[in-house]
Amino acid sequence: MKPTLFVLAAGMGSRYGGLKQLDGLGPNGETIMDYSIFDAIRGGFGKVVFVIRKDFEADFRTKILSKYENHIPVEVVFQSVDDLPEGFVRPEGRTKPWGTNHAVLMGKAVIREPFAVINADDFYGRDGFRVLGQWLSKADGQNRYCMVGYRVGNTLSESGTVARGICRTDANNYLTGVVERTDIARVDGRITFTGDDGQPTTTDDNTPVSMNMWGFTPDYFRYSEEYFKEFLRANIDNPKAEYYIPLMVNKLITEGTATVEVLDTTAKWFGVTYAADRQGVVDKIRALVDAGDYPAKLC
């Protein structure tokens, strides 16, 4: 059975000033998602599921879903701040979504096969989908997951410093933890970040970082449901608390419930965080098209 691609497309896009998911950046108005789906099809994926918000469903179906009718099966699920387990009610004034792992839970009803999770507004590159598709196509058990580890040198911004989750791995390349680091940049040819002591620290170009590209089997939904209740009991009155994928993954690793293999990729990541980033992404996509990595018109 071919794996499914699960696309997190419900984000607000507030810093960008609009819905990044629907912004046409390619030569013929292609979105970043369009390139991800093109690469996923090349990487052996057999279905795409999008998690979105109900309020932009009409635009999404018109601008996104209609493109894929003859290329790959697609489904849509919805994330709502009111979608909580039995016994829990959204606190008055809570408008912030419950986070990326809450979004993943929305896929439970339609995903029965190994699946990948990606952000809608990140350009992951062909090789990322290749290594992830290969791993998921052979996934046949439970409690064994994976994450594509991007080389930090391939994720830097030309506009300034970035924050990244630097991966700690054991001798067999299994994830032991993700440490958030800030102020990452290339300085005098070396990659530096702010260490625990507040001082600049260097790291190797090939150090793996998490760009939220995960591979799971359906048993992950069960663990996520259980822990979401635990999360809500502790955080429901915190208006800013979010249930993130790394939070869930770290719990599974530290408790010995699951393993997460870190897959290396040569792909270069890029994305749009602020409106000012847009032109740089347009130029990078154009360069990839000119190099023959992608057709001028995807579909």
What are the residue ranges of the model-derived segments?
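A structural signal for short hydrophobic beta-strand segments in well-ordered beta-sheet cores
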Residues: 22, 166-169, 262
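Hydrophobic packing residues within well-ordered alpha-helices of enzyme cores
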Residues: 60-64, 132, 224, 281
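A C-terminal functional module that forms or caps the active site or interfaces directly
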Residues: 225-258
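Conserved N-terminal catalytic core of the sugar/cofactor nucleotidyltransferase
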Residues: 1-7, 27-117, 124, 129, ...
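A phosphate-binding catalytic loop at a beta-strand-loop-alpha-helix junction
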Residues: 4-17
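Conserved core of the sugar-phosphate nucleotidyltransferase
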Residues: 126-214, 218
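Active-site metal-binding loops of divalent metal-dependent hydrolases
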Residues: 12, 122, 152
